[in-house]
């Protein structure tokens, strides 16, 4: 009986570890959270899971973390990762707020229900060794290194703050200036914070493009930190809204092209099909040459090629940039990034915020009448005067108009939008209105995603925020 009880206990521990790993996407290559995609010995995967259990220390199978120090220069750093993974495993079981991806999501009750696809977990195991092999250029910093770099996180060195993190300017001991993103401990429970940290780190591991922020390293010592390449011109938001000087059109147009190239890469050319979910002016950094860099992958999701979209709850993102289908139904695919990109283009054209702080009016609602009339003089930032290229402005206006269409199917993909912005379709394309494009659209889309219903939902949500 004692032997049988012990086996039952081991089986239960194994199942708990499997559940936690699946929650974090560390085992499931088909899951939108399984972003690390590291190579490991599949034959040892089951024993690796067992050896991770705190109740199975006597197992003769070696832990998957046992060789960490061979890869990481400091055993202290490796132990930090071990403790972090163990802290997740020991937490009480709870599911993260991610609804499984659906093969096809109903927008109305009139549609027939479709079966949810079964997800098959892979046999690969997440290991610190495999993780560090993925990006050997990344440094694993100690807390003391980051504290010294930021004058112990002096508030004067804070260059940004969000709901879940603070960003500090720092200077490393080698003289390199970096931006240090410090995840706030009070924002989320420890289990969820660590999960989000690993998920974001895993997504960044697959990103390598000039128009994406570059990670220098990270730290799990006394908190969770990302160390990023410093952008001397700050964010696009600070240049558009926080400066008295007018950002010249040449730079604005270059930034628009850079963001488009970066998003096209994430959606089409990246090893993983990545949906950013939080494209906004404050998440676009500008390097020394005003090259746009997409940053903050904290809300990003990746989708396998054969899955049309993902459905999430609760809805996360920034009010004013949320696409109707995401805001109203939780649908996540490339088209929600396209919508947010359209809002961003309107901000670049007008220097108005996504939501006006005084009137609380959406820039989309404000700009649509001018876009429909092609009224350039009414929509362009008056500070620009006539100091812009009319053809380029026309391209950006047309692109923005297509991006913010309330029906997702009517929005072009980023590959197409890059062509439009660069004028690769010829001048005739610029004369074509977004509404003139012929495209098959399901009737339920037209019913559920009318402009009026979306605006009503926006007003309702805005009212809730103000209460």
Swiss-Prot record:
Enzyme class: transferase
UniProt: ATP binding residues: 159-167, 181
Matches recorded under Gene3D superfamilies: Phosphorylase Kinase, domain 1, Transferase(Phosphotransferase) domain 1
Reaction(s) catalysed by this chain's protein: L-seryl-[protein] + ATP = O-phospho-L-seryl-[protein] + ADP + H(+); L-threonyl-[protein] + ATP = O-phospho-L-threonyl-[protein] + ADP + H(+)
GO MF term set: ATP binding; GTPase binding; kinase activity; protein serine kinase activity; protein serine/threonine kinase activity
Record's note on what induces expression: By fungal pathogens such as Phytophthora infestans and Botrytis cinerea. Promoted by ethylene in the vascular cylinder of primary roots and in the root cortex in the root/hypocotyl junction zone.
Entry annotation: catalytic residues: 278
Predominant place of localization: cytoplasm
EC number: 2.7.11.1
Keyword Nucleotide-binding among record annotations: yes
Regions of compositional bias (Basic and acidic residues) in chain numbering: 1-24
Subcellular location: Cytoplasm; Endomembrane system; Nucleus
Residues recorded with modification Phosphoserine: 282
Phosphothreonine sites (modified residues): 142, 318
Region (Disordered): 1-73
GO terms classed as biological process: cellular response to ethylene stimulus; defense response to fungus; defense response to other organism
PROSITE patterns named among the record's database cross-references: PROTEIN_KINASE_ATP (PS00107), PROTEIN_KINASE_DOM (PS50011), PROTEIN_KINASE_ST (PS00108)
Bias-annotated ranges (Low complexity): 40-71
Coiled-coil segments: none
Statement: the UniProt record of this protein carries the keyword Magnesium: no
Membrane topology term: Peripheral membrane protein
Phosphotyrosine carried by residues: 326
Protein kinase domain ranges (all copies): 153-430
Description of how the protein assembles with itself and partners: Interacts with ARAC5 and ARAC10.
PANTHER family: OS08G0249100 PROTEIN, RECEPTOR-LIKE CYTOSOLIC SERINE_THREONINE-PROTEIN KINASE RBK1
Name of this chain's protein: Receptor-like cytosolic serine/threonine-protein kinase RBK1
